[in-house]
Regions:
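Conserved N-terminal phosphate-binding loop of PLP-dependent enzymes in the Aspartate aminotransferase
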Residues: 1-186
Length: 186
């Protein structure tokens, strides 16, 4: 979900790495999370396997009570059109080196033990506090939120995935807030 719809500078992580998946799930980015919608994409071979089987076996379910809601479909089509019109996937790709440089600028901070990134995503891993794993991450989350930045944490790792429309000045602002949060927790 996080690596789809341009986040890595390509339509999906599979495209960036030259992989052709047999099955792929997608959701939030399909409608920019404005309206709930999800999808399952399958290759022709997988689809045919389900559809060409005996009549008494499980089919590839593709319609439920809430399927094909017109509002969600319209939101999905509009979102896909905007991705293309605004060249957002290409924009993300063009920001990647700036993003990486800015994120790796946090490397020398106390308690930062690893930084991982690709595209417009990053994970800043902090050393766990003795006897309280996850507390540094939680405290960083709270400090960032109080300073106006919404981040996600997993244990003691701050996970960042900014919007595709982020500007370089906003990247600087975000990482200044994250750096301050990390510096102000023990």
């Amino acid at each position: 979900v996080i690596t789809g719809f341009g986040r890595l500078g390509a339509s999906f992580a599979a495209a960036r790495f030259g992989v052709t998946p047999d099955i792929m799930t997608l959701a939030k980015g399909l409608t920019n999370a404005a309206v709930p919608m999800g999808a399952v994409l399958v290759s022709g071979e997988i689809f045919d396997t389900f559809m060409d089987g005996p009549d008494n076996v499980i089919e590839l379910f593709h319609g439920y009570t809430y399927s094909s809601h017109p509002l969600a479909c319209a939101a999905g089509l509009a979102t896909l059109a905007l991705y293309e019109k605004e060249n957002l996937f290409e924009r993300a790709a063009s920001l990647e080196s700036y993003w990486q440089s800015a994120v790796h600028g946090l490397q020398g901070l106390e308690n930062v033990i690893d930084i991982r990134d690709i595209g417009l995503t990053a994970g800043i891993e902090m050393a766990p506090r003795d006897g309280a794993p996850g507390m540094r991450g939680y405290e960083a989350l709270v400090a960032c939120f109080e300073a106006g930045a919404l981040v996600r944490v997993t244990g003691d790792t701050i996970a960042l995935s900014p919007p595709l429309i982020i500007a370089e000045t906003q990247i600087d602002e975000l990482l200044t807030i994250v750096a301050s949060a990390i510096e102000n927790i023990s």
